[in-house]
């Protein structure tokens, strides 16, 4: 085998493997790094001869589409909802998290006031000469507590494009994975390729804690999916004119691109930050106050109660630096909000109270089959308790309800005599199929008998 490898050579220039830095194998052929560089030079020369061919084609199609679409006007001070109005809208969709909703309401209101502000730094008075800087938002809280939902609800109320990105898929430019500019492409697509509209949108970057570097100290090796991504995001978060490939993928110096100014885009970053409590605990020299219960560690009830409220006061930027975020990144996220873990009572409210609550969703689904669905209070409580045990927050609720409703939703559409159905605690506890039978005409609800 070693003798065979010694005779490997480039299929294009004929140089042996030991004469080049890299030899890449294909189906029966090999190409060296020098030939790859030569191919790139040839392609670059051809693009230089006609660099605007593809660019102009895309620009013309984009302008043609924009001409047929009514552009949304930029926000005015009068049209921006006040913080109290924003929080009221959030209350209709998100249960609990009062401090976080208040922080978000003020931050979003100030951000869109900034967009409506005419001051450009050239005015004659102190106020008109003031340039307002952008304040991005960092959300910290356990999984399933409503971080993404809060961002989605804000975008819905403000009627602006909204895009979600997963930080774990991002890598530093030049490495396998997504470039940070692809985040802007998603926002642009949500805005139907309207650049002006996209520049007023909201981007939510989830799992931001997963790009923390492994230690507080800078690494001597390249961390392309951790610190490298943080560095790549800095200019975008602060505000820059980014060149976005309209078809996604990697940027090319002579390829087609769309310019987007990120200075008016609101970035909201969220993450669970598992283990951040240990960092705070170490600094304070007190018992742990973290999000995740540890069976090997004794925690008092007062410790657990402090998680939501007191961590807001206890957490400092230096804790995030020790966790693995670089200081420059933290500096570009000046507004932070801590979201509390959801207890069983909050999960009960999530099932029934919000506008798009799960119970309302399933009632709507069955109403299409002319069946009125209801849930006993103890059934709702049992569902919430089971979701709380699974430790995945509100995300567990849908899975549990789907399990309970599977056989019901399978059989009810074919049974035209059934007009009402009630979900009981027994059904939740058993979470089994069972036979659906109609009640007599003088009974109001349908009961479920175990098979």
Swiss-Prot record:
Signal peptide: none
Annotated ranges, domain ClpX-type ZB: 1-51
Matches recorded under Pfam families: AAA_2 (PF07724), ClpB_D2-small (PF10431), zf-C4_ClpX (PF06689)
Binding-site positions, Zn(2+): 10, 13, 32, 35
GO molecular function: ATP binding; ATP hydrolysis activity; ATP-dependent protein folding chaperone; protein dimerization activity; unfolded protein binding; zinc ion binding
Region (Disordered): 50-73
Domain of life: Bacteria
Keywords: ATP-binding, Chaperone, Metal-binding, Nucleotide-binding, Zinc
UniProt GO cellular component terms: HslUV protease complex
Gene3D superfamilies: 1.10.8.60, ClpX chaperone, C4-type zinc finger domain, P-loop containing nucleotide triphosphate hydrolases
Single Gene Ontology BP annotation: proteolysis involved in protein catabolic process
InterPro entries attached to this UniProt entry: AAA+_ATPase, ATP-dep_Clp_protease_ClpX, ATPase_AAA_core, Clp_ATPase_C, Clp_protease_ATP-bd_su_ClpX, ClpX_bact, P-loop_NTPase, Znf_CppX_C4
Record-linked CDD domains: RecA-like_ClpX (cd19497)
Binding of ATP, residues: 142-149
Database matches in SMART domains: AAA (SM00382), ClpB_D2-small (SM01086), zf-C4_ClpX (SM00994)
Subunit structure: Component of the ClpX-ClpP complex. Forms a hexameric ring that, in the presence of ATP, binds to fourteen ClpP subunits assembled into a disk-like structure with a central cavity, resembling the structure of eukaryotic proteasomes.
UniProt record similarity statement: Belongs to the ClpX chaperone family.
Family matches, as NCBIfam families: clpX, PRK05342.1
Protein name, UniProt field: ATP-dependent Clp protease ATP-binding subunit ClpX
Source organism per UniProt: Prochlorococcus marinus (strain NATL2A)
């Amino acid at each position: 085998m070693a003798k065979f490898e010694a005779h490997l050579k480039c299929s294009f220039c004929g140089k042996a493997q030991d004469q080049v830095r890299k030899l890449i194998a294909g189906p029966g052929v090999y190409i060296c790094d020098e030939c790859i560089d030569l191919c790139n030079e040839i392609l670059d020369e051809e693009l230089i001869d006609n660099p605007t061919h593809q660019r102009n084609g895309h620009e013309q199609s984009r302008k043609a589409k924009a001409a047929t679409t009514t552009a949304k006007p930029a926000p005015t001070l009068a049209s921006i909802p006040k913080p109290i109005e924003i929080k009221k809208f959030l209350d209709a969709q998100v249960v609990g998290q009062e401090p976080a909703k208040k922080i978000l309401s003020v931050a979003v209101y100030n951000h869109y006031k900034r967009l409506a502000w005419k001051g450009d730094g050239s005015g004659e008075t102190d106020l008109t000469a003031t340039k307002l800087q952008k304040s991005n938002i960092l959300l910290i809280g356990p999984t399933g507590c409503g971080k993404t939902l809060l961002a989605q609800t804000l975008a819905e109320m403000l009627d602006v494009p909204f895009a979600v990105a997963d930080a774990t898929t991002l890598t530093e430019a030049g490495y396998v994975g997504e470039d940070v500019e692809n985040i802007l492409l998603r926002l642009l697509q949500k805005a139907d390729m309207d650049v002006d509209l996209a520049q007023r949108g909201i981007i939510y970057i989830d799992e931001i804690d997963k790009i923390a570097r492994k230690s507080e100290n800078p690494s001597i090796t390249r961390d392309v999916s951790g610190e490298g991504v943080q560095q790549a995001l800095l200019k975008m978060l602060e505000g820059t004119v980014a060149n976005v490939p309209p078809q996604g993928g990697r940027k090319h110096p002579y390829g087609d691109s769309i310019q987007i100014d990120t200075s008016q885009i609101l970035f909201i970053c969220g993450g669970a930050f598992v283990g951040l409590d240990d960092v705070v605990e170490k600094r304070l020299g007190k018992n742990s106050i973290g999000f995740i219960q540890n069976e090997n560690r004794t925690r008092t009830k007062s410790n657990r109660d402090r998680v939501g409220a007191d961590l807001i006061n206890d957490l400092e930027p230096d804790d995030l630096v020790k966790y693995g975020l670089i200081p420059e990144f933290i500096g570009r996220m000046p507004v932070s909000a801590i979201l509390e873990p959801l207890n069983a009572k909050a999960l009960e409210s999530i099932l029934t109270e919000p506008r798009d609550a799960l119970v309302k969703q399933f009632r709507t689904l069955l109403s299409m089959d002319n069946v009125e669905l209801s849930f006993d209070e103890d059934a709702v409580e049992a569902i919430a308790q089971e979701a709380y045990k699974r430790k995945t927050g509100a995300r567990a609720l849908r899975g549990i309800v789907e399990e309970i409703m599977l056989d019901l939703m399978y059989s009810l559409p074919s049974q035209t005599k059934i007009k009402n159905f009630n979900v009981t605690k027994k059904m939740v506890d058993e979470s089994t199929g069972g036979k659906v039978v109609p009640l007599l005409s003088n009974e109001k609800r349908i009961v479920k008998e175990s098979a």
